[in-house]
């Protein structure tokens, strides 16, 4: 099913909402969020220990965290503030995965106080953590970076070797031995190799890399690996012609690799964790803004009342976000515009040379 270019909100609904909440604002599709969370849970139901730790950084909103909590989701936190937010909505203990890098002392102290599972990014963090909190937790995780280029068939998905995250193969082996000697009893392994992959093959391929590494680590270090965290990376379709991922196919793909690699190694008790963010929220949120100025110089500009502060991706990454002019969903896209915000930065643009229907002042634009 192709993503409709039509958003989940109508012009009439927005006209009602703006009577209470003026633009710009973010809007969420609660029904969509719930259905997706349920589908994810079902896709991994074959694994008794399965848990999704929602990547709070993706949408740090306590109301949304509470919805996901109803479906058994925990929180993947990477900062002090995210830990505070998780605690505020009643998510604590092992329902928090603290995956950070370049971590300040205060963050480790709070993670420990809340009883979070700490996922170490670097081998030097073992001593730093022990010095900071006075002990090594009994349950601990390490982040792995296999290096090199990560490919699916002939497509380069990403370049882990160029990533600042995780430990090398030698380092994670050494880390597990050291942590075991310092009293850790239950271990986890985590890796993130590619971002926003719109393919059903990414998770099963990542799973194979991690499962084989887990078998080797358990054999070489004698530790008990309790969980394997596939982190995030499952993407969403941003353009109308992209096909969305099928989470059922992905879950089944991971199950096959689990039975091929872990079960024969006597590791059929390992829990699978995920840290999806964009996949959980991306399709179910939008930014609603109003056209307030039209400027015609060397190009045609539509100025809106939102700016990069409300949605940074287009300015930061040049990322594509679909724009719908409400009430003109079926009108021909025969006008070329740059859609801009009001920041004194020339990159404050939601779209460049975008074909849209003719935009009138006062029109509501949905960026999704």
Q: For each predicted feature, which ranges?
A:
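Structured core elements
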Residues: 74, 97, 119, 141-143, ...
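Short, glycine- and charge-enriched coil/turn segments that flank and shape catalytic ligand pockets
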Residues: 46-48, 135-136, 222, 244, ...
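Active-site loop/helix belt of alpha/beta enzymes
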Residues: 132, 146-290, 356
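Active-site beta-loop-alpha junctions enriched in small/polar residues
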Residues: 31-32, 55-61, 78-81, 101-103, ...
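A charged N-terminal "starter" segment
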Residues: 1-138, 174-181, 185, 219, ...
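Short acidic, gly/pro-rich beta-turn/loop elements at beta-sheet edges
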Residues: 64, 108, 150-152, 199, ...
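A broad detector of the eukaryotic-type serine/threonine protein kinase catalytic domain
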Residues: 19-23, 116, 194, 235, ...
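Charged (often Lys/Glu-rich) extended helix/loop segments that serve as interaction or gating elements
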Residues: 259-262, 267-368
């Amino acid at each position: 099913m192709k993503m409709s270019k039509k958003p989940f909100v109508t012009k009439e609904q927005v006209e009602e909402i703006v009577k209470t909440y003026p633009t710009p604002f973010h809007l969420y599709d609660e029904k969509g969020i719930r259905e997706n969370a349920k589908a994810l849970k079902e896709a991994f139901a074959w694994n008794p220990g399965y848990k999704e730790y929602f990547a709070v950084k993706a949408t740090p909103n306590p109301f949304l965290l509470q919805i996901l909590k109803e479906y058994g989701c925990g929180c993947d936190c990477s900062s002090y503030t995210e830990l505070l937010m998780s605690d505020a909505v009643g998510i604590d203990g092992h329902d928090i995965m603290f995956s950070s890098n370049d971590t300040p002392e205060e963050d480790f102290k709070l993670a420990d106080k809340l009883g979070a599972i700490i996922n170490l990014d670097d081998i030097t963090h073992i001593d730093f953590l022990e010095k900071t909190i006075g002990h090594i937790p009994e349950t601990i995780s390490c982040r792995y970076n296999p290096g090199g280029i990560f490919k699916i068939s002939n497509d380069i998905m990403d370049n882990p070797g160029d990533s600042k995250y995780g430990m090398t193969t030698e380092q994670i082996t050494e880390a597990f031995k050291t942590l075991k000697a310092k009293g850790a009893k239950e271990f986890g392994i985590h890796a993130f190799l590619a971002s926003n992959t719109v393919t059903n093959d990414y998770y099963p391929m990542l799973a194979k890399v991690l499962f084989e590494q887990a078998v080797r680590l358990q054999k070489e270090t004698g530790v008990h690996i309790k969980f394997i965290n596939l982190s995030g990376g499952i993407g969403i379709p941003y353009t109308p012609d992209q096909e969305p991922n099928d989470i059922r196919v992905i879950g089944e793909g991971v199950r096959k690799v689990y039975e091929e690699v872990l079960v024969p190694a006597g590791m059929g008790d390992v829990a699978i964790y995920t840290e999806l963010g964009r996949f959980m929220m991306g399709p179910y949120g939008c930014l609603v803004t109003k056209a307030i100025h039209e400027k015609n110089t060397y190009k045609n500009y539509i100025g809106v009342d939102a700016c990069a502060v409300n949605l940074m991706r287009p300015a930061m990454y040049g990322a594509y976000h679909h724009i719908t002019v409400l009430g003109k969903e079926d009108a021909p896209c025969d006008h070329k515009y740059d859609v801009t915000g009001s920041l004194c930065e020339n990159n404050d643009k939601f779209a460049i040379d975008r074909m849209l229907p003719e935009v009138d002042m006062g029109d509501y634009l949905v960026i999704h």
